[in-house]
Amino acid sequence: MALAACVSTQGPVQQAIRRIDPAYVAMYGPRPDEPHPLPATDISEVDPRFLRREVAYYGREEPGTIVVDTESRYLYLVREGGRAIRYGIGVGKEGLAWSGRARIGRKATWPRWTPTAAMIRREPERNARWAGGMEGGLNNPLGARALYLYNNGVDTMYRLHGTTEPWSIGQSVSSGCIRLFNQDIIDLYSRVPVGSPVVVLRGQRLFDVEDETRVSSAY
């Protein structure tokens, strides 16, 4: 099942947030230094638990490992000393989500996107015109960066990538890939080398509810 296209068709979820921490306004602010100058991400309708933060980490994975908890909609980059950077994510729809162990096989800045044949068949009016590929840019579904997941040296066709749909973070909407805010994928990209291990969990939470409360309050 190849789902490299990583696009979604679900509309935004309206979840108003009255106040935004100025630190987060800066964190998700514009990036004019990018090859395609990146505007600020509107986080006013994003559940604040999906905004990037450092947390206590009680998992067993080694530092440098990326752990994707699809049930909780979090991605963790494990650090030393029982800590991790936690990012909010959007994940694949039920029946399309991928899970397992992989490694970062390659990395790309403002990556090119090509819809798969299956994606074109499902939504020809949306995807057929890009059968030859779409160059990187602000309208590209992969966003500002992409990390390509490989298993035993073989491309799994799944990516950790940015998004043109920031409202989708925290939701189950994409076609199998794992999406982050563009500012977050830029941050993650800068921290992980090719070869970094990735664990994608499905059907289970990395932490139980009590542990998640402890993790979130540890920031």
Question: Locations of the language-model features?
Answer:
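N-terminal pre-domains immediately preceding structured catalytic cores
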Residues: 1-178, 182-219
